[in-house]
């Protein structure tokens, strides 16, 4: 892990370019009854790249050597050849300390480090490389929590003038992307994630009334936007 932390000491480049390593998802769910899950990396570039992966518990500034996690990523550092792929395996070492009655959220980090061109090495010039970091939601879901697809329908909405109190009584993380009247103009200005058994207040562009039925869009396990109808209490 100390070796991974050294990557954060790199000086970033003067030039920016898009990620060459593509990940096969926008979020990852670890079912409690599975031995491991896999994450597929694909290098779309014409040159190899180094990729390092680690999990954090929400502190994006924490370096890998300071993070304690029950999960093991293999390999933590890998070379992904040009036009090729690499499979990361994530295994739960021990579920001690993890809640058994609700989901736990982690973040999967991927740091892509492009190679130094041979011509630059030969010229003996100082090289500033750009390391590109991406973060993905990584949710541990204990077995026996029930149907995640129906979770958003259980959200409790309470009108409070031009704001809306939203309570999530379920054991699941629910990300609400949009609230509207019958799929019309969005009443909310930003996406909000609700932790299990938590509440938040959302500012709305116009007031809603008790008894009104709203369309609530939430993001499912596959990153798709799914609309459900919820009545304001």
From Swiss-Prot:
GO biological process, one term: chaperone-mediated protein folding
Signal peptide: 1-18
The keyword Chaperone is assigned to this record: yes
Coiled-coil segments: none
Record's GO cellular component terms: outer membrane-bounded periplasmic space
Function text: Mediates assembly of pili by forming soluble multimeric complexes with pili subunits as an intermediate step in the assembly process. This protein is involved in type 3 pili assembly.
Family from the record: Belongs to the periplasmic pilus chaperone family.
Name of the protein in its database record: Chaperone protein MrkB
Gene that specifies this protein: mrkB
């Amino acid at each position: 892990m100390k070796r991974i932390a050294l990557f954060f000491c790199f000086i970033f480049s003067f030039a920016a370019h898009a990620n060459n390593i593509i990940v096969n998802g926008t979020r990852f769910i670890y079912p409690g009854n599975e031995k491991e899950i896999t994450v597929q990396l694909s290098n779309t570039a014409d040159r190899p790249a180094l990729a390092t992966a680690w999990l954090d518990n929400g502190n994006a500034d924490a370096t890998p050597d300071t993070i304690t996690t029950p999960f093991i990523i293999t390999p933590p550092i890998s070379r992904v050849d040009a036009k090729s792929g690499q499979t990361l395996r994530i295994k739960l070492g021990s579920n001690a300390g993890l809640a058994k009655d609700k989901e736990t959220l982690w973040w999967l980090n991927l740091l892509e480090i492009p190679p130094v061109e041979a011509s630059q090495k030969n010229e003996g010039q100082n090289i500033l490389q750009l390391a590109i970091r991406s973060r993905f939601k990584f949710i541990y879901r204990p077995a026996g929590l029930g149907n995640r697809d129906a979770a958003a329908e259980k959200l409790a909405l309470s009108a409070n003038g031009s704001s809306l109190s939203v309570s999530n009584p379920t054991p699941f993380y629910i990300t609400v992307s949009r609230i509207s009247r019958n799929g019309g103009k969005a009443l909310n200005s930003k996406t909000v994630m609700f932790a299990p058994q938590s509440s938040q207040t959302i500012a709305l562009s116009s007031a809603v009334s008790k008894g009104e039925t709203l369309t609530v869009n939430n993001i499912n396990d596959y990153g798709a936007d799914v609309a459900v109808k919820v009545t304001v209490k």
